[in-house]
Amino acid sequence: MSVLVVGISHKSAPVALLEQLALDGPGLHKLIDDVAASEHVTEATVIATCNRLEIYAEVDRFHGSVEEVSRLVVDRAGERTEAMLPHLYVHYDDGAVSHLFQVVAGLDSMAVGEGQILGQTRAALNAGQEIGTVGPALNVLFQQALRVGKRARAETGIDRAAPSLVSAALDRSRATVGELSGKRVLVVGAGSMAGLATSTVAARGTASVTVVNRTSGNADRLAEEYGARSATLAELAAELAVADVVISCTGATGTLITRDMVAAATVDGRELSILDLALPHDVDPTVADLPGVSLVGLTDLADELRDSDAGQEVEAVRQIVTQEVAAFLSARRQASVTPTVVALRSMATSVVEAEMERLTSRVPGLDDDIRAEVLHTVRRVADKLLHQPTVRVRELANETGAVSYAAALAELFALDQEAVDAVTRPEGLT
């Protein structure tokens, strides 16, 4: 079994195509279920964010599983296969581990080093566990990836060195409304991105911050945390009319802020800066044509964030990821031989027990003390004979290459494959 990643992100596809792949909760669960139901897949989950969709699966073969999983992504986008495939990327086995660690460490994010990916990865793990499609392999992999992501941020300044998506968008808004100090800001949404937006603008001396969300309870909680006020979605048009800056980042699947709403809000000729950080977009793109209105979307920010240089911090995180990948793969290779080693020692124990029974039947009057000494001696002989091969096979398992030393050991000692498979695979790799 090996891990397969099939994905698409801001690095491989335009935002317009990513919008077609946006998933709500039920849609995400259905995709995970569909992947898990594929013929060659035994475990599955999906990382879905505003700028990436990545399917992680434990598979029993490469080519068949790639075709199956890629087809699910193509079908989700509603695109022709030939139009979609060039934007997909595939990572397998060791490469899949390396890719996930880079993603969770923030190296692959649109805003390098951003911390939201940690929560999004945890959400992917939780979703798979809730549905029942995440088993030991993906659980171990994702748990370790989360530890790597936390280590990267604890030991470096990667999350502070690079600008966040919100900060970059606010910097772009200066051309229209100037500094945020004294401005009225409207945040639409109450998820993790909205939380980041609210905390960021609240720290910049704004005159007021208002949080609007479809679910009033979520808006109330977010507003209370940052000293803002909350409003309902029914009040959106009225709130637009008094805002200087709008940051929209909901999970809605349709246009939330229409051209007519913005036109009505700016009828007096005032300037309005709108930052649309949602995928699919919350704001009608044509509002950018209205007088005094500026619109900044994810497409506008992509190149700017890609070119930002976190310098030494990025390099430090890369080194951490390299170390962690090597350690994880080493532990995984050693764990892969454990069932064979356990089965071999179990076979040796069975042989010793059978021979002792044979000795007892042939020498019925054997003294108990002598019998115990013989048993002890035979066990020591068996242990010494097996010690070097089992230690060496663990050492050799650390070496990369195509040779399967566990398979060779099983073949040499004629181990029953069912006995090997019956050994529980360790789940505590660190």
Swiss-Prot record:
Q: Which GO terms fall under molecular function for this chain's record?
A: glutamyl-tRNA reductase activity; NADP binding
Active site (catalytic residues): C50
Q: Where is this site: Important for activity?
A: H99
Catalytic activities: (S)-4-amino-5-oxopentanoate + tRNA(Glu) + NADP(+) = L-glutamyl-tRNA(Glu) + NADPH + H(+)
Keywords recorded for this protein, A-Z = NADP, Oxidoreductase, Porphyrin biosynthesis
Q: Which residues bind NADP(+)?
A: G189, A190, G191, S192, M193, A194
Keyword NADP attributed: yes
What Pfam families would the database entry show?
Answer: GlutR_dimer (PF00745), GlutR_N (PF05201), Shikimate_DH (PF01488)
This protein's pathway reads: Porphyrin-containing compound metabolism; protoporphyrin-IX biosynthesis; 5-aminolevulinate from L-glutamyl-tRNA(Glu): step 1/2
Where substrate binds, per the record, is at: T49, C50, N51, R52, S109, E114, G115, Q116, Q120
Output the Gene3D superfamilies linked to this UniProt entry: Glutamyl-tRNA reductase, N-terminal domain, NAD(P)-binding Rossmann-like Domain
What does its UniProt record remark on the domains?
A: Possesses an unusual extended V-shaped dimeric structure with each monomer consisting of three distinct domains arranged along a curved 'spinal' alpha-helix. The N-terminal catalytic domain specifically recognizes the glutamate moiety of the substrate. The second domain is the NADPH-binding domain, and the third C-terminal domain is responsible for dimerization.
Kindly give any further remark recorded in the entry.
During catalysis, the active site Cys acts as a nucleophile attacking the alpha-carbonyl group of tRNA-bound glutamate with the formation of a thioester intermediate between enzyme and glutamate, and the concomitant release of tRNA(Glu). The thioester intermediate is finally reduced by direct hydride transfer from NADPH, to form the product GSA.
| Role played | Catalyzes the NADPH-dependent reduction of glutamyl-tRNA(Glu) to glutamate 1-semialdehyde (GSA).
Q: Which PANTHER family match?
A: GLUTAMYL-TRNA REDUCTASE
Instruction: Please give the subunit comment from the record.
Output: Homodimer.
Q: Which family does it belong to?
A: Belongs to the glutamyl-tRNA reductase family.
Q: What is this protein called?
A: Glutamyl-tRNA reductase 1
Q: Which organism is this entry from?
A: Nocardioides sp. (strain ATCC BAA-499 / JS614)
